[in-house]
Amino acid sequence: MLKKQALSGIRRFSLATKQSFVKTSYKLPRKSWLNTAKFNTIRYASTEAAKHNKGSIKQVIGAVVDCQFEDADSLPSILNALEVKLPDNKRLVLEVAQHVGENTVRTIAMDGTEGLVRGTAVIDTGSPISIPVGPGTLGRIMNVIGEPVDERGPIKAVKYSPIHADAPSFEEQSTTPEILETGIKVVDLLAPYARGGKIGLFGGAGVGKTVFIQELINNIAKAHGGYSVFTGVGERTREGNDLYREMQETGVIKLEGESKAALVFGQMNEPPGARARVALTGLTVAEYFRDIEGQDVLLFIDNIFRFTQAGSEVSALLGRIPSAVGYQPTLATDMGAMQERITTTKKGSITSVQAVYVPADDLTDPAPATTFAHLDATTVLSRSISELGIYPAVDPLDSKSRMMDPRILGEEHYNLAGSVQQMLQEYKSLQDIIAILGMDELSEADKLTVERARKVQRFLSQPFAVAEVFTGIEGRLVSLKDTIRSFKEILEGKHDSLPESAFYMVGSIDDAVKKAEKIAQELAA
């Protein structure tokens, strides 16, 4: 009896204590990182005062650094940047990821932690990582924290912006559909890109994602005339170097005059913290041109999978329980926070082209599958098509676009794209019969379908200007008008007499006719 009374008394006391705690607990307001400076002004009276908030390094484990501050009231906020002064006037930036108790914050380093020791002084900057933005970034190469890495002196910044920001509000966004012409036949005809949209370039290793992106920069950046921001996320340093030199040769970057592109790199050799944040750095540079200057900006990200991969590494370093296939549990949140910032507003637009590496060619892998949800158009590069020697190796049946609407494209373009895909699908279904029984067992109608489909398949190939050094074939940029006319003539049977080889690696149908004449002359000789 006494035992029961004691237990009920403990339960009543626990419940009363819990209710009292809930009533008296201080609820912190939900703050966006756009208002970080304002939040720190409340806490420290000024951002400058926050800079006097000093701590010291308590523990270093790889890219994770624990920093201890004097008292709990002076702890830096989550996502704040901390600075460590290193020899030779260098600085190491740490980003706060967790509050772990005992006046200690756990941070992720944006560079190597070699040489760090316990007790080294750390300064709270009072805001997230801030980078230089404005016209001064054009023609320059920056790293994740906005430092120039092209050995051409400091960047002349209009202002400094934090890399963590809110997406534009619903009222600010614009939704007028407009086609972005690329000059690449297979894209413009079957999966056209939206101006101010998000485009995904999916493919496994070595199918031509980077070459495709470089061709898009070459075609669109020149014709488009606006500003471009190229963000290299966890890819090869050699490719970044090649791109920089090519941009100088083509005049997109001028060392003396006015450049049209800014480059931001966090390559394969960088720590996971840098690779997980460099995409946000590039996006922040693009947002300035959209929001302040009202420009239509092109944002190229190569490779968005490395952003997810780096996030997974950071998550594991912080001790979070992994999700499916070992990815971070916050995969969808991380991706959504970044992708929602890439949009068209009433002031300007950001059109983004993102290369997406597909691990083991598996499109159901959580990383590419999460990216799919945010895209307006998907261009899938297929290994089976690249094995046929058809480049760009775009899968015409797997690539999709929300712009495939007769109200946007017009009836002629929409119907032609449907007819081309139908013919290729019929050819695909007949391939098994051909492999077993041969062409002779097909009906006359099926034989004609196969012949035209093979010509269409070869005609979807195109010589690229950036690949001219490998192929020896001059690059071709084909207008949408010529693309529609060319495919219409092939489907109508106007070029049934031409050999299949005449349609391979040419621009418009006129080039195919000239190539056929050249082949005929060579055979006659």
UniProtKB/Swiss-Prot annotation:
UniProt xrefs under SUPFAM superfamilies: C-terminal domain of alpha and beta subunits of F1 ATP synthase, N-terminal domain of alpha and beta subunits of F1 ATP synthase, P-loop containing nucleoside triphosphate hydrolases
CDD domains listed in its UniProt record: ATP-synt_F1_beta_C, ATP-synt_F1_beta_N, F1-ATPase_beta_CD
Subcellular location: Mitochondrion; Mitochondrion inner membrane
Swiss-Prot/TrEMBL catalytic activity: ATP + H2O + 4 H(+)(in) = ADP + phosphate + 5 H(+)(out)
Keyword Protein transport: no
Enzyme class, UniProt record, top EC level: translocase
Keyword Transit peptide: yes
Origin: domain of life: Eukaryota
Database matches in InterPro entries: AAA+_ATPase, ATP-synt_VA_C, ATP_synth_F1_bsu, ATPase_a/bsu_AS, ATPase_alpha/beta_chains, ATPase_F1/V1/A1_a/bsu_N, ATPase_F1/V1/A1_a/bsu_N_sf, ATPase_F1/V1/A1_a/bsu_nucl-bd
Protein name: ATP synthase subunit beta, mitochondrial
